[in-house]
């Protein structure tokens, strides 16, 4: 499984991760997202 964490800014995590072509995303607080590719 690939994982990358980003500062997503105003985008929601799911939108941000989907646009980055990951399978799904999870917020980890303070506007940061971890995106996962299953």
Swiss-Prot record:
GO terms for biological process: defense response to fungus; killing of cells of another organism. Keywords: Antimicrobial, Disulfide bond, Fungicide, Plant defense. Disulfide bonds join 5-27, 13-33, 17-34. It comes from the Eukaryota. Belongs to the DEFL family. This is Putative defensin-like protein 105. It comes from Arabidopsis thaliana.
